[in-house]
Amino acid sequence: DGQINNNEVARIFVEWKKQANCVKGDDRKTLLNRNFIRMQERLAKLEELLKGIGGLKRFSEKYPQKAMLIIDKTLRFHQHRYNVVGKHLLYLDLDGFLHIYLRHVEELTIAGYYSERTKFQLDEKDVEITIKHVMKALNEEYQVFRDKYPDKQFRKYEDDAYYCNGDYYALRVEPDGRLIQFYKIGKG
């Protein structure tokens, strides 16, 4: 029937048609529906991560400014690719983004919830820039590692942590290239 079943693929396809001025008939309605489904899926992920403090509703009531920030970031998030050189992909998806931001970004600190985690001494907007810088700097090493160990996690911890601008950063990357952890471990 020519229908695309994967919501994200269908949404991107209709977005592309919109940019190419090829939108026809039900395409606008399809795009609205696909965007609504995407929004629901993303908010469900956020709800799951916040269930330890009573869920998204309670979080929003108790911390309205923080809720606005993380909801906006969640809904606007686009997957980041950190390398264009090399055959092995390095990227950050929504799950990795939420893991990093909810645990390690000071502006999103919630009393008693991941509060023991090391926080970036950066503005929220600068965290993304730092991650990008570190991942690009590690790309060559990552490519060599991935060729040698295709099924192992790439890790930088403790003595092997990456040094950048006076701080050391620990990270973990899944075999498929997905960044799943990134945090500051102390001053140099």
Question: What are the residue ranges of the model-derived segments?
Answer:
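Ribonuclease/tRNase effector modules and their secretory precursors
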Residues: 1-188
